Amino acid sequence: MKKILTAICVAATTLTACNDNFLEKYPLTDLTEENAFKEYDNFKAFMNPCYEMFTNTTIHTSINNSYMNAQFYGDWYGGLVTHRDNARNPYAYQTITATADGGGWDFSYIRRVNIMLSHLNDGALTEAQAAHWRSVAYFFSAYWYMELIDRFGDVPWVNKVLDESSPESYGPRTPRAEVADSIVARLEYAAANIGNFNDGDNTVNANVVKAALSRFLLREGTWAKYHGLNEPYETYLRKCLTVSQELMDAYPTLYKGEDKQNQPATGYGEMWTTESLKGKPGVIFYKEFVNNVLMNRYNDFEHIAANSADVPQYTVDMFLMKNGLPIGNTASGYQGGKGKDMWGTFADRDPRLYQNIQPPYVVAPHKGAVDNVNTFKSWKFLKAGDNNQGHVVTADEAAKYRYYIDYMGANEKCLRGGSYGGEGMKRCPGQNWGAALTPVSPNLTTDSRVPYMRCRTGYYFWKNYDMWEFSTGSSAFCTADKPIFKIEEVLLNYAEAAWELQHFDQAVADKTINKLRDRAGVAHMTVADINDSFDPNRDKGNAPWWTGKGGKFGNYNVNPVLWEIRRERQIELFGEGFAFYDIRRWAKAAYYVNRQPCGLWTTATDNIYAPKANAYSGQFVDYEEIMRSGRASAENNSAGSGWIYTYESPLAHGGWLDTYYLSMVPTSQRALNKQLTQNPGYKELFGLSD
């Protein structure tokens, strides 16, 4: 019988030659191992396919064509976003299925790295060149192993080329602690020894390595602490402070943006909508897109019906007020809540909210003469006395309807993007790629005014939305670069590691979190003001939605200062795919995943977003009851007002299982290698045999 080998030893490795920068990595010339390592450029060509890790969709922070392709899943699984189209978070509703193959259990990149390492001493390279390529290889192997141990825990550590006769191909999983130490050692070697040999623009260098090291040291250090692993978590966190400080010294300023509208938090928003990130402050490494060479659909999706990312009420509530206070703080000045519309919810909030979620507005479609002040090519502002869908607009309503258009900048042309006349970054009102107007925000899926730019909760995700890019709504034509490593993450890594080591004070807050707040236009964090009552909604270890089948880990009272540090991370990195990594390393998955999602507060009879003609006809739910009891007792369509119902409580399906902290080892791999053990809980969950 033909022997089938585990992926560890037979993972396909195509030998390819590629161009010199991290733009596109398509093969140009086929090589064989016999002729692949004759000169320096051969090593470069052989390693270039490893850059595909940064677009690999099993990594939730990867950049792959659109938000919905990878980052959405990190935020969705992590409980910060929901799916518009009746798709439930599988970790919340226990719809995870047994994994037969795949699931990220893949060692093909590791095999490629090991093949290259085996040829470093063939005589084609100088000592310095060999150290450089060893460093590049160590970086890529460490980066992939970072994901493997985050996903599976113990995994086989493979540091040489294997074949079907190699006993290591059928060996056991290496303990997580050993793999973690090896990852750190490889990244530290790479940071110290990677050279400057002009491998091309935007390729792996010492600072890229340090950024990965900062990420891993925080991730693994906190995982070890909160999961009770026998790992030197304090050593990891101290190293995180050191390497993060080196990067903070190298990147002392943040990107402030270039849009003429000069919105608050412009630099924060434009990190995801700028045509070229080359040389931009704080950008360590990025995915480059170029017209007619390599393009994406990030912005494209957020103009059309295909954008299925929704934001629930509890995530909107996470964002601070502009004065730096949580909305539950009695001094916050929060104007939202029961009986309040979206303008009240958004009033005086952290401007990063407006860069992630489209603010509310109402305009009237228009055709005819224009003055480009109040009346534009395809729309006009509503004035007091105007008739809007059978409703006579009041003066207060007219002012409210236009407030965020003035704030974000008016979409004056409402034409097709690029050479067709689109201009600027985020603008209101919205439009699709056929220059069709979205006259109201939110454009609720139930009773929507137009069939695109719709949302179920009322909170429309538009992090990558801009007006200057061109698309057709069906193909990849967008060219805004996207960050992979940036100093903002490093600042947050430093702040969190400092708190875990009991070093967090006002000086640390000022050089990390308050730098981010200065750019966003949010009041500083004052550490001395953060006490037990600073945020009444803080996770104190007694959240009612913690009940269910999960709960072995994480039912602890989160320190008030740590709560604010974590909040800042979730706000600053929202929409980037970090959530599922973070809630698992904090051992807080049940807290974030088990919450029943819902949308904004509205009414059935006088819907402000689409008066009279398109009043909301969907179901309601009591969000206050959810916050009190963990779930709503009923979805009530007769009350006539309430928060928009989206999904039932995850607790009705059992909620988060602690089994999910690690992924299932694929059954096909265990069939090939009898020494591979299964992660805890999966045998019982799926009735698997040994």
Which functions belong to the PLM regions below?
Residues E147-P156, N198, F216-G228, E500-H503:
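Short coil/turn linking the two alpha-helices of tandem helical-hairpin repeats
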Residues N19-V81, E188-Y189, K210, L218-G430, ...:
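An aromatic- and glycine-enriched ligand-binding surface/loop that stacks and positions planar moieties
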Residues M1-L28:
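Bacterial Sec-dependent N-terminal signal peptides
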Residues P351-R517:
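C-terminal substrate/ligand-recognition segments
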Residues C18-N19, D106-Y109, S182, P264-S332, ...:
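Long, intrinsically disordered, low-complexity segments
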Residues E39-H60, L80-F152, E168-D181, A185-D201, ...:
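Conserved, well-structured interaction surfaces
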Residues R134, S141, L213, E220, ...:
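Structural register within alpha-helical repeat arrays
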